């Protein structure tokens, strides 16, 4: 891998293009091993008011080596822009980190993000000095609007959170990628390493994965597999794919081929 091919977000550069979530692991030890196997440098954690005081949540931040990872608090569970802004400020006060994965999700069934609320919250939070990474549906117009208000990335979903269905709308994700002036991080719904490779092949700058690794039979092995998928996809994108054709094209030239005479047919 070209060590000069870095992912730059909010003025910071990273050699890994795989971001990881920290939820759904059976214990902290498995989570730590998976993070290590993935090579990730950015990890996201849900920080809500109730979780900061709830038994079982204590220790998550202690389990993360914050000298090794860029912490990315998120507003998972927030249903309105106003709630997301409040939780973002709480997260910054609790962690000292201004990076934020912005999630505004009013829909409890399909967990699809609210574009209007996300844009409104993003504008407020950027003005408050946050480095905002908004989670959105794949919409090129919305992506440009989020970029215009100062978001550090745009994070279009591949498919609904936790479904593992992969890239269901690659054409729409391409509209987000095309013309983007900030990194595009495909998030949610990736199920297998080939999904990550496909996202990077399309031109996405990175992917964020959680459930596909945490719920794998062997999370550590799956974390490594996703790292390889991301690397393969990025290399394939940089190498430039062949032109697609409607008709077949032989890989070996026909010129110079020795042709035998047709066998005689008995009378």
Swiss-Prot record:
This chain is encoded by the gene named: thiG
Q: Give an example GO cellular component term for this record.
A: 2-iminoacetate synthase complex
| Assembly with partners or alone | Homotetramer. Forms heterodimers with either ThiH or ThiS.
Instruction: Quote the EC number.
Output: 2.8.1.10
Which SUPFAM superfamilies does the UniProt record give? ThiG-like
Return the annotated region ranges for Disordered: 243-267
According to UniProt, the name of this protein is Thiazole synthase
What is the predominant subcellular site recorded for this chain? cytoplasm
* GO MF term (any one): thiazole synthase activity
Which residues does the entry assign to the active site, renumbered to this chain? 101
Transferase listed as a keyword: yes
A Pfam family that the UniProt record links to this protein:
ThiG
Family stated for the protein in its record: Belongs to the ThiG family.
Kindly report, in one word, the top-level EC class recorded for this enzyme.
Answer: transferase
Compartments, record wording: Cytoplasm
Q: Which GO terms describe its biological process?
A: thiamine biosynthetic process; thiamine diphosphate biosynthetic process
Kindly list the positions annotated as binding 1-deoxy-D-xylulose 5-phosphate: 162, 188-189, 210-211
Pathway field of the UniProt record reads: Cofactor biosynthesis; thiamine diphosphate biosynthesis
**Source organism of the structure:** Deinococcus radiodurans (strain ATCC 13939 / DSM 20539 / JCM 16871 / CCUG 27074 / LMG 4051 / NBRC 15346 / NCIMB 9279 / VKM B-1422 / R1)
């Amino acid at each position: 891998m070209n060590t000069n091919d870095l992912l730059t977000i909010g003025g910071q550069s990273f050699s890994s293009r795989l971001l990881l979530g920290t939820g759904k692991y059976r214990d902290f030890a498995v989570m730590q091993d998976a993070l290590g196997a993935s090579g990730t440098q950015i990890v996201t954690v849900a920080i809500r008011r109730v979780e900061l005081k709830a038994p079982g949540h204590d220790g998550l931040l202690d389990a993360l080596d914050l000298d090794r990872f860029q912490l990315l608090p998120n507003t998972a569970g927030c249903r309105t822009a106003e709630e997301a802004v409040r939780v973002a400020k709480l997260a910054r006060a609790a962690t000292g980190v201004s990076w934020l994965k912005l999630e505004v999700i009013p829909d409890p069934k399909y967990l699809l993000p609210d574009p209007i609320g996300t844009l409104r919250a993003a504008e407020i939070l950027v003005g408050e000095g946050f480095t905002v990474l908004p989670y959105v549906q794949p919409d090129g117009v919305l992506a440009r609007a989020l970029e215009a208000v100062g978001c550090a990335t745009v994070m279009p979903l591949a498919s609904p959170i936790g479904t593992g269905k992969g890239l269901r709308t690659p054409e729409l994700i391409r509209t987000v990628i095309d013309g983007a002036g900030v990194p595009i991080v495909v998030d949610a719904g990736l199920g297998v390493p080939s999904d990550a490779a496909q996202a990077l092949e399309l031109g996405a700058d990175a992917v964020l994965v959680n459930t596909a690794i945490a719920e794998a039979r062997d999370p550590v092995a799956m974390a490594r597999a996703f790292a390889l998928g991301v690397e393969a996809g990025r290399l394939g994108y940089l190498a430039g794919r062949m032109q697609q054709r409607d008709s077949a094209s032989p890989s070996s030239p026909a010129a110079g081929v020795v042709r035998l005479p047709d066998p005689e047919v008995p009378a």
